[in-house]
Amino acid sequence: MASSASLETMVPPACPRAGASPATSKTLAFSIERIMAKTSEPRAPFEPRPAALEADSSQSKKLLNLCSPLPCMIPLQPLGYEVPSKTLLSYSEFWKSSLRAGGGGGGGSGGGAPVCGASGLCKTNCGVCCKAELGLAPSALPAGRVIKPQVINQAVGLPASGSLYYFNYLDSTAYPPSELLGGHLFPSGLLNAQAPTSLAAHPKLFLLENAKLASLAADKFPHPASYPHKERLHAPLEQVLKENSALTAERGGVKSHSKLPGGSTDSKPKNFTCEVCGKVFNAHYNLTRHMPVHTGARPFVCKVCGKGFRQASTLCRHKIIHTQEKPHKCNQCGKAFNRSSTLNTHIRIHAGYKPFVCEFCGKGFHQKGNYKNHKLTHSGEKQYKCTICNKAFHQVYNLTFHMHTHNDKKPFTCATCGKGFCRNFDLKKHVRKLHDSVGPTATPSAKDLARTVQS
């Protein structure tokens, strides 16, 4: 009895679709020995179903009764990641289309093309088991789409690189995860372990050529972390998938249109270089927007204050100043601002956060613009000079406000003492130091009049 039990474990049961007479006689002999045996033996994990139930199951979405009772182990990618059809296939749909093309809709032994025969490891150039026998065209393969695999989370006998592998089961009830994770059902190329000798002769384990992709990814990632739900892969693994997709397309003679991030179907890069500074842009529109930096043109002018801007988007943001709408309010001091970015910069004052530090004197600043203006004081260069008094300034806007001192234009007037100032900043500073600690109290009419005179 012991010899019969060992013989039964070493030789797998015959394929229900093979229909060969030697396999039928062997199965009958095994059945007689099992009946005569008194020892209890485990039930077969898969039994062929009647032809009536077989026809009903062919219409269902989940294909349970295939040639192999073992689940088809396919290395998939993390959940929610879309890949081209050459890299990853929906093998359940593939088997449905293959059986229809071969004429094998029922579970009988005759009729239709033979499925899988006695092949243990599929070595066809297509990477899909029995595609050459079935004669499937590449158009029958499903297009690339998001596939939701079942993820194995147990760590029974798996190495550290096992967390990279996601498997899709055609029949997850046939074998529990504990048996699948035992190691005897996995190929050596997939888990970097020595496979049993009986694996090579197993006629019902279809190892696909895409297992090379998982093995290659394991070399790139020796100790990967678990991928969360619908999260993008890291850049090295994306590169592995991209290279594998290109190799598969070359073998099949099909033009690859990669949908991976960073992939481009256009082989000619579009580079537009600025002739003045040499800066490169990917579109002609961006180069056109950049050119006013060198020409000094400000075609977009504000109708209220007359200030010019290089871009229309900057003018739109500037117009919010004149509407006096300040929806963004500080929770600590109650000060309101026109834009949320200005509020975020203001919050740094309360937190004492000064990320921009001068490398010459160590002084910190809340804003990057103030930091750049301060650095000009260390250079000693004042290229903007007044034509009347020859006073020099670091920036052009300081020269613009200085010119108001020569034409007696002081558009910003204090509502308390009536003193005029060239800049609104000077008015706020005057009120904060002399009159109160709240802020400027200039009337709106005075501000509007000041901006009208300035324009």
From Swiss-Prot:
Q: What is its main location?
A: nucleus
UniProt xrefs under PROSITE patterns:
ZINC_FINGER_C2H2_1 (PS00028), ZINC_FINGER_C2H2_2 (PS50157)
Span of the annotated motif Engrailed homology 1 repressor: 27-42
Tissue expression per record:
Highly expressed in neocortical layer V, moderately expressed in layer VI. Expressed in subcortically projecting neurons.
What superkingdom heads the lineage? Eukaryota
What Pfam families does its record include? zf-C2H2, zf-C2H2_6
Which Gene Ontology CC terms are recorded?
Answer: nucleus
UniProt region (Disordered), positions on chain: 1-22
Q: What happens when the gene is disrupted?
A: In null mutant mice, no subcerebral projection neurons are born and no cortical projections to the brainstem or the spinal cord ever develop. In contrast, other populations of neurons are unaffected. There seems to be a redundant role for FEZF1 and FEZF2 in diencephalon development.
Species source reads Mus musculus (Mouse)
Query: What is the protein name stated in its UniProt record?
Result: Fez family zinc finger protein 2
Q: Which family does it belong to?
A: Belongs to the krueppel C2H2-type zinc-finger protein family.
Q: Which UniProt keywords apply?
A: Developmental protein, Differentiation, DNA-binding, Metal-binding, Neurogenesis, Nucleus, Repeat, Repressor, Transcription, Transcription regulation, Zinc, Zinc-finger
Keyword Iron found: no
Check the record and name the InterPro entries matching this protein. Answer: Znf_C2H2_sf, Znf_C2H2_type
Q: Which PANTHER family match?
A: ZINC FINGER PROTEIN, ZINC FINGER PROTEIN 771
Please give the biological process terms from Gene Ontology that the record holds.
Answer: axonal fasciculation; cell dedifferentiation; central nervous system neuron differentiation; cerebral cortex GABAergic interneuron migration; cerebral cortex neuron differentiation; commitment of neuronal cell to specific neuron type in forebrain; dendrite development; dentate gyrus development
Cellular compartment(s)? Nucleus
UniProt keyword Zinc present: yes
Q: Which GO terms describe its molecular function?
A: chromatin binding; DNA-binding transcription activator activity, RNA polymerase II-specific; DNA-binding transcription repressor activity, RNA polymerase II-specific; RNA polymerase II cis-regulatory region sequence-specific DNA binding; sequence-specific DNA binding; transcription cis-regulatory region binding; zinc ion binding
Task: Give residue ranges of zinc fingers (C2H2-type).
Answer: 272-294, 300-322, 328-350, 356-378, 384-406, 412-435
The function of this protein is: Transcription repressor. Required for the specification of corticospinal motor neurons and other subcerebral projection neurons. May play a role in layer and neuronal subtype-specific patterning of subcortical projections and axonal fasciculation. Controls the development of dendritic arborization and spines of large layer V pyramidal neurons. Plays a role in rostro-caudal patterning of the diencephalon and in prethalamic formation.
